[in-house]
Amino acid sequence: MSLTALIQFRRFRIFSLYPQRERLFVRKIIVLLLAACGFGSSVLAQGLAGDWIGEMNGSFKVRIHFERVSSGFKGVLINPSGNETVLDQITSDGTHLHFAVDKLNLSYDGVWSEEESAWKGSLKFQQNYPLVLKRATAEEMAPAAHKRPQEDAINAGPAPYAQREVRFNNFAGHNQLSGTLSLPNGEGPFPGVVLVSGTGHNTRDEDVWGHKVFLVLADALNRKGFAVLRYDKRGVGGSSGDYDAATTADFASDAEAAVAWLRTQTQIDASRVGVLGHSEGGIIAPAVAAADKSVAFVVMIAGPCIRGDKLFVLQSAMTAKAYGAPDGYIASRKVFDQELYSAILSAPSELDALDRARELVAKGVAGKIVDANEAETLPKDVSRPWERYFLAYDPAPTLARLTVPVLALNGSLDVQVPAKENLAAAREALKKNSKATVMELAGMNHLLQEAKTGAPNEYNDIEETMSPTALKIITDWLSENVLRRGHEPTS
């Protein structure tokens, strides 16, 4: 993955898509990652124009293009998709090179090495770290083409199920939701699954990092004999409503409306309708089941099971560690996050929360824990309704109320909803539910992909959208616990 791709990374938060301030926070983490791994760039002034490439840890690649202009040089970083980030302050006297990315408080200084035909220098961010760049071929500069074999197979068809566009109302939320209902071949009635996506402006397919997670998941469920309803989140795609004003409780209200609508369909067995949620959806699924006793089952994929503020602190530290940030920064940021979230939780109003956040962020900037770009948006983001609600929400009491079959899955490499802490909380909350299954899937990340580190920058580069092993565990569990009568899949 290129430097620009990393800089443009927007943290999943705990789920699928990401508030603006997560992007700014992760930019700082990414810079630390690049520094720790020796990332930089340089070029001989006489031949500076053209393409250059560097590699970090054998996998992360940075591509740079320089052009000569009347005032000197201009340059960009190019990510695998071809998106560019402008470099600042590019200067070279023939043997030395300097450039900066001002908005990240990052700079590079290098010296030309005749022996290696490369720039050897240091990336500066709080301290200095080594880096080397060499000339790049056209092939090396080409945008990476990521294969999606599971999605390609689905699109190639034919499929043993039918799909149709649907709309349903959430009268409590005063909005209408648009989605896709997919039904296995046959007469039915079929057990039904409502898919609930994670945080962010997600469509019905949960399009994240170049993957269509719910497309692949729905296909697997349909082939096992389940009807599936997936929908665009409020304010996204074909759904109405105000996304930005919503909290997790509002998204849960939408999921409740989806369950109620699905039960009314003639080909659905209303007694066997359940909810499957990913990430934030993994909080919503048990909340819907606790509020509606007729929900037949719950599946939680990477669903948080500890209070929001504790999760965010843990997530921040583990994500930074996965990116290779220095231990000192991780420790300092943990203290800062704890103090910030405590202040937000104790604030009596959104305005008070904003004021307290501004004070703490100013201290964070002075202590070089928060950079200037993050400081612009962080106070507003952490004081908004969604964040304040989530910070205070503890999923465990809701889980403890469930008596229906529950499957809770986390990947061992998940850095956004870490398996150890969250599954321990799930086991404790569900200990009286004999129908609950809690599993940690070895070597899998937040999307249940087979991964190396679990860091979010791997998601796009991994070809599989969801591990076939994980899909089999989910569908086998549902077959055992739900699919006891009625239609059997034709293929």
Language-model segments: which ranges?
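Short alpha-helix in the alpha/beta-hydrolase fold that links the catalytic acid
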Residues: 404, 418-429
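Short substrate-entry loop that stabilizes the transition state in hydrolases
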Residues: 188-190, 199-223, 308, 415-416
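Accessory cap/linker subdomain of secreted extracellular hydrolases
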Residues: 299-401
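Conserved alpha/beta-hydrolase
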Residues: 216-238
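N-terminal cap/lid segment of alpha/beta-hydrolase-fold proteins
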Residues: 142-188
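Short beta-strand/loop motif that positions the catalytic acidic residue
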Residues: 402, 408-410
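Central antiparallel beta-sheet cores of small beta-barrel/beta-sandwich binding domains
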Residues: 46-114, 118-127, 160, 166
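Alpha/beta-hydrolase active-site loop
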Residues: 245-266
